[in-house]
A protein has these predicted regions:
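RNA-binding basic/glycine-rich loop and surface signature characteristic of RAMP-family CRISPR effectors
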Residues: 27, 79-103
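Nucleic-acid-binding small beta-barrel platforms of the OB/S1 family
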Residues: 1-4, 67, 92-245
Length: 245
């Protein structure tokens, strides 16, 4: 079945793969998926033109829903069917995100947020794995090398319920920006400080999502960020959903 959807996030996974998600015309959240190896980053483009990006309205041929709680949004699609329609005007884009806002992370997933290791919920339950919130406070942007010599991209914030989270940012645009700034000679602390100032000076929306379970903790799924940063006058939309921790 062909139908349009507005993309809310494009996120980095592994080995050149990405995760995408958004909403259809009825306000249903959808995560288009493909069998392994999944969606390659090259499919975000038609020639040299980006056609799948946050705020893009696209048409896809959807085939089989494959919900597995909490990832109830999953639905297979035909990658050859993607048709770019338009970029959403700012106010329409803002209105759509505002309509999906939840008061906090726990309210998005409708199940307790457990801790140690990190923040997580139990796999196999819950009505959704993606949602939007407006943070009460952006506390810290973290960009540094891990003990495994891999770049980390994290955000620490307080949600509307007063809970504080420090979560991984998997947003493709966010990661490209940080990587580009390093390539131009900026230091990671300077990059993090600049992003923090920009977020703290703006209205911010966060798109928050759950990772897939992984071998070390097979019964746990971890929240994080993927999506985009869109800076408008006095408004920043940071979609942070995680397809993986």
């Amino acid at each position: 079945m062909k139908k349009p959807m507005v993309i809310t996030e494009v996120t980095r996974m592994q080995e050149g793969r990405v995760c995408i998600a958004g909403y259809d015309q009825h306000g249903q959240c959808l995560r288009p998926v493909l069998p392994p190896p999944g969606i390659h980053e090259s499919t975000l483009y038609a020639g040299s033109r980006a056609i799948i990006f946050p705020s893009a309205k696209v048409e896809l041929e959807f085939t089989q829903p494959t919900p597995r709680p909490p990832h109830t949004e999953d639905i297979h699609y035909d990658p050859a069917s993607v048709r770019f329609i338009e970029r959403q005007p700012e106010e329409r884009w803002h209105k759509m995100l505002q309509a999906t806002v939840c008061p906090g992370v726990a309210a998005i997933f409708e199940q307790p947020i457990l801790t140690d290791p990190g923040h997580y919920v139990l796999d196999g339950q819950g009505p959704r794995s993606l949602g939007t919130l407006r943070p009460a406070r952006i506390i810290q942007v973290i960009h540094e090398l891990s003990s495994e010599n891999k770049w980390q991209y994290r955000l620490r914030f307080e949600d509307g319920a007063g809970a504080v989270f420090r979560l991984t940012v998997t947003d493709l645009a966010w990661r490209y920006y940080c990587d580009q700034q390093r390539a131009q000679g900026e230091t990671p602390p300077h990059i993090a400080a600049s992003l923090l100032r920009a977020l703290q000076a703006s209205d911010v929306y966060l798109r928050v999502g759950l990772a897939r379970g992984w071998q070390k903790y097979p019964s746990c799924v971890f929240p994080g960020f993927h999506g985009q940063v869109r800076a408008y006058p006095r408004r920043t939309i940071l979609s942070i959903n995680a397809c993986e921790a």
